[in-house]
Design a protein with these regions (language model features):
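C-terminal structural segment of proteins
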Residues: 1-330
Length: 330
């Protein structure tokens, strides 16, 4: 049986109280909201904080007005029909109902990167002399690399990135707001630009976008993404006024595919335009051999998933494909 390591549990009632505790405890502390990813990681000794600062009782993080509180659960997002469709689709494809009831949007955006050599129990990792991400000196995926190439595993980030979302980060010393795409580094270890003393408190989502999210995973019932495509378009009639396409799970960070987004501007979504845009999207996918399914196939299938996304935004009936791939029709 894998047991949790000993830790001290703190339960602040406000963001500022949580920020003060976080600043005071320094590297010994970690934040916990739903804990659906953190607690299993702790059982595998991938993380061993001495202090856990719970955000479950911080009511400020659950408010939803002009911005989405970081403590909003994924189930609540799925059920909020006024939220963008792409975000709701992404949230609905995370894990299972029970985990979505616990997991939060803030937690999903800050989700740890994943790798077949890292997401194993302690004894398994010890047998291979650990890895660069935790306790070792070698990246077993790219042995010549000095950078960890563990892959981003968040579903909601590509969907929100396509929507032009921004996030607020609060520390005891002050607060700042950044575009979501500026929250991430392309590094499997140092994957967040959020400072250790900062708390992600809310997500601001611009309006006026048509959006969608398509996810590839090994198990149809539930699994982490091995590819995520988030797409959003503003139309003027049937012409693309503005477009944003983001990829997830094919690098250590989710990222925008700017060439494809620029290519779509001012064009109608004809089959030929969709094919070329999808080719541009696929050209930016560079998955590593650190997740389920063959990496070359994952790269090749990126174009098909981008095509599904753009066809759905064009208004095509993609329900059959979505049921086959995503097992849902949100």
């Amino acid at each position: 049986m894998m047991r949790l390591p000993w830790f001290e549990h703190r339960a602040p009632k406000s963001v500022q109280e949580a920020a003060r505790i976080l600043a005071g405890e320094g590297p010994n502390a970690m934040l916990i909201a739903g804990g659906t990813d953190l607690l299993p990681n702790m059982k595998r000794r991938q993380m061993a904080p001495k202090v856990l600062i719970s955000l479950r009782h911080v009511s400020e993080l659950k408010r939803n007005g002009s911005a989405l509180g970081a403590g909003t659960t994924l189930t609540e997002i799925v059920n909020k029909k006024e939220l963008p469709l792409g975000l709701r689709q992404a949230a609905h494809q995370v894990a299972t109902v029970h985990l979505r009831n616990m997991g939060t949007i803030g937690g999903n955006l800050c989700l740890d990167t994943r790798c077949n050599y890292y997401n194993q129990n302690y004894e398994w990792r010890k047998a291979i002399d650990f890895c660069l991400k935790k306790d070792g000196e070698i990246c077993w995926v790219a042995t010549a690399s000095k950078r960890c190439v563990a892959a981003s595993s968040t579903d909601c980030a590509p969907a929100l990135m396509a929507l032009g979302a921004r996030v607020k980060l609060v520390a005891a010393s002050g607060e700042r707001e950044v575009a979501l795409e500026d929250l991430y580094n392309n590094d499997g270890i140092d994957y967040l630009k959020r400072r250790p003393d900062e708390i992600l408190t809310e997500v601001s989502i611009p309006s006026g976008w048509n959006s969608t999210y398509w996810k590839l995973r090994r198990r149809g019932a539930f699994d982490f993404p091995v590819l995520g495509v988030g797409a959003a378009i503003r139309f003027s009639g049937d012409t693309v006024e503005e477009a944003r396409i983001a990829l997830g799970a094919v690098a250590s960070r989710p990222f925008l595919v700017e060439k494809a987004s620029e290519f779509l501007k001012g064009k109608k979504l004809t089959d030929e335009v969709i094919e070329e845009a999808s080719r541009l999207v696929a050209s930016r996918a560079k998955p590593m051999d650190n997740a389920d399914l063959d990496l070359y196939w994952r790269k090749d299938v990126t174009a098909a998933f981008a095509t599904h996304a753009l066809r759905e935004l064009r208004g095509d009936d993609m329900s059959e494909a979505r049921l086959r791939i995503a097992r849902q029709l949100v």
